């Protein structure tokens, strides 16, 4: 009986070790993660360039209808950015970077929220509030970049030019 118990314990321990190493092999490396998310970010960057075409001119226009159109463009860009963020969240993350990436996703959510508020302010014709929201978008983008700088993103790196 004692020999059988030892064999069972040894077998269980070996299976746990194998399961642990198999799980570790499933975790992508940081470079593999970047390779998986960059195409998503690239598609979103290109979509936002199309959505936000001429938005700066419209937002600074004296015509209220042009300002409202700019607001609609920012709201649409916010929705596209949110969809891209959701896609990014589904990509398997390296276990070592999980906490950092969760903070990055939180920062990206704030960018999305601020883009939406910027669009709402422009649609309401409140240019001063819109200017404040634009600064908040830039600050949130910088915060997201500060969290994700170790990944050396290209398309996932946010800049003011992404949203103007």
Model-derived segments and spans:
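Bacterial N-terminal signal peptides that target proteins for export
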Residues: 1-9
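Terminal, positively biased "leader/anchor" segments
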Residues: 2-3, 16-19, 131-132
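C-terminal region of N-terminal signal peptides and the immediate post-cleavage residues
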Residues: 8, 15-32
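Alpha-helical segments in soluble extracytoplasmic regions
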Residues: 29-119, 129-163
